[in-house]
Amino acid sequence: MRLLRSLARKIASLKEAKVALKVASDPRKYFNEEQMTEAYRIFWQTWDGDIIRSARRFVEVAKANPKLTKGEATNIGVLLGLFIFILIGIVLLPVIVSQVNNLTSGTSPQVTGTNATLLNLVPLFYILVLIIVPAVVAYKIYKD
């Protein structure tokens, strides 16, 4: 829980997060296919394992890239929002899996029976959300 609170505080301090959430509701207005391809390339270039440092580097590189600065200034906010969403999801996945395993396995599991079966499905649904949300956003952007 401390990890979640510290991540929430760090994300809340970013001014772009508010704009990112606003623009993420309809990204087709702000991106074209070329911009999404370039943002994806920059995403993997700037990722170094630290969410905050990677996000800052991503914004710096994206602002300097002429392919991404052609559109409105809110493009950076949406890209940052998607970047942070994916990074937090990747970082929290092992934590969720280990907590589910601790609750449902071992010599004296705390959750048994049908509830354990349902609890074991939580990581699967979490992974589906991590895949579906960026895919839907990318589809809406590509459709434009």
Swiss-Prot record:
Keywords for this protein: Capsid protein, Membrane, Transmembrane, Transmembrane helix, Virion
Membrane topology: Multi-pass membrane protein
Molecular function per GO: structural molecule activity
InterPro entries in the cross-refs: VP1_VP3
Main location: virion
Places the protein is found: Virion membrane
Example of a GO cellular component annotation carried by this entry: virion membrane
Transmembrane segments: 76-96, 118-138
Propeptide residues, chain positions: 1-71
Domain of life: Viruses
Family label: Belongs to the fuselloviridae capsid protein VP1/VP3 family.
This protein's name: Structural protein VP1
The organism of origin for this protein: Sulfolobus spindle-shape virus 1
Taxonomic lineage: Viruses, Viruses incertae sedis, Fuselloviridae, Alphafusellovirus
